[in-house]
Amino acid sequence: MSSIGTGYDLSASTFSPDGRVFQVEYAMKAVENSSTAIGIRCKDGVVFGVEKLVLSKLYEEGSNKRLFNVDRHVGMAVAGLLADARSLADIAREEASNFRSNFGYNIPLKHLADRVAMYVHAYTLYSAVRPFGCSFMLGSYSANDGAQLYMIDPSGVSYGYWGCAIGKARQAAKTEIEKLQMKEMTCRDVVKEVAKIIYIVHDEVKDKAFELELSWVGELTKGRHEIVPKDIREEAEKYAKESLKEEDESDDDNM
């Protein structure tokens, strides 16, 4: 509620006296309470990594994925309410399909990001609807445009990034991403770093078990968005665990 007055958070169409739209801020809180997702753009593609929390031992492995194929050349990573994210993934797929039907070639990622951002923004304007409780990243690679990465938040704002993080540990993840020389790295290099960052920011006290989801799109995949092969993912996880172990040992030595 507003510090100036109450009742300004009942509708997305109402501003508070200090110029805030509380329903949009609450939607962003839903994203901040979600597991972490990161996207990194490098010289030959884009890599996504998601910390998918396992809330029950009864879940089937691989269920409730947070990485989606939007089009052959576009991938999507989400944080926030999964049902809202699935709905937006369907909207993005429809936009990509309609563009190809009308113009005969793949939709440029900036155009797709702008179109979906407009749709998300429309849900912040009316009292009859609520804002989407998720943020998501879109990544693609083409010979003409190279690697591209965009993030859209619940307010409908879209930005292009070299590296981006969303979810509960986004600040810690961004700090780690900033240490990387992304413009000089390849997808194979970045996959290991993405896995390492997810393991670093994972809160073992509050959230015990999690599955690491990794996907990429780039020269290596011939411009197609694909899940990272199991052997490469396992290699990346091994690298992440060894790096964490080395850091813990060096911290113990310094004490």
Curated annotation (Swiss-Prot):
<feature type="modified residue" description="N6-acetyllysine">
    <location>
        <position position="230"/>
    </location>
</feature>
<comment type="function">
    <text>Component of the 20S core proteasome complex involved in the proteolytic degradation of most intracellular proteins. This complex plays numerous essential roles within the cell by associating with different regulatory particles. Associated with two 19S regulatory particles, forms the 26S proteasome and thus participates in the ATP-dependent degradation of ubiquitinated proteins.</text>
</comment>
<feature type="modified residue" description="Phosphoserine">
    <location>
        <position position="250"/>
    </location>
</feature>
<dbReference type="InterPro" id="IPR029055">
    <property type="entry name" value="Ntn_hydrolases_N"/>
</dbReference>
<dbReference type="GO" id="GO:0043161">
    <property type="term" value="P:proteasome-mediated ubiquitin-dependent protein catabolic process"/>
</dbReference>
<keyword id="KW-0647">Proteasome</keyword>
<comment type="subunit">
    <text>The 26S proteasome consists of a 20S proteasome core and two 19S regulatory subunits. The 20S proteasome core is a barrel-shaped complex made of 28 subunits that are arranged in four stacked rings. The two outer rings are each formed by seven alpha subunits, and the two inner rings are formed by seven beta subunits. The proteolytic activity is exerted by three beta-subunits PSMB5, PSMB6 and PSMB7. Interacts with AURKB. Interacts with CDKN1A. Interacts with MDM2 and RB1. Interacts with the C-terminus of TBXA2R isoform 2. Interacts with DNAJB2.</text>
</comment>
<keyword id="KW-0007">Acetylation</keyword>
<keyword id="KW-0597">Phosphoprotein</keyword>
<comment type="similarity">
    <text>Belongs to the peptidase T1A family.</text>
</comment>
<keyword id="KW-0963">Cytoplasm</keyword>
<feature type="modified residue" description="N6-acetyllysine">
    <location>
        <position position="206"/>
    </location>
</feature>
<dbReference type="Pfam" id="PF10584">
    <property type="entry name" value="Proteasome_A_N"/>
</dbReference>
<feature type="modified residue" description="N6-acetyllysine">
    <location>
        <position position="57"/>
    </location>
</feature>
<dbReference type="InterPro" id="IPR000426">
    <property type="entry name" value="Proteasome_asu_N"/>
</dbReference>
<protein>
    <recommendedName>
        <fullName>Proteasome subunit alpha type-3</fullName>
    </recommendedName>
</protein>
<dbReference type="InterPro" id="IPR050115">
    <property type="entry name" value="Proteasome_alpha"/>
</dbReference>
<dbReference type="InterPro" id="IPR023332">
    <property type="entry name" value="Proteasome_alpha-type"/>
</dbReference>
<feature type="modified residue" description="N-acetylserine">
    <location>
        <position position="2"/>
    </location>
</feature>
<dbReference type="GO" id="GO:0031625">
    <property type="term" value="F:ubiquitin protein ligase binding"/>
</dbReference>
<dbReference type="GO" id="GO:0005829">
    <property type="term" value="C:cytosol"/>
</dbReference>
<dbReference type="GO" id="GO:0005839">
    <property type="term" value="C:proteasome core complex"/>
</dbReference>
<feature type="modified residue" description="Phosphoserine">
    <location>
        <position position="243"/>
    </location>
</feature>
<dbReference type="GO" id="GO:0019773">
    <property type="term" value="C:proteasome core complex, alpha-subunit complex"/>
</dbReference>
<dbReference type="Pfam" id="PF00227">
    <property type="entry name" value="Proteasome"/>
</dbReference>
<keyword id="KW-0539">Nucleus</keyword>
<dbReference type="InterPro" id="IPR001353">
    <property type="entry name" value="Proteasome_sua/b"/>
</dbReference>
<dbReference type="GO" id="GO:0005654">
    <property type="term" value="C:nucleoplasm"/>
</dbReference>
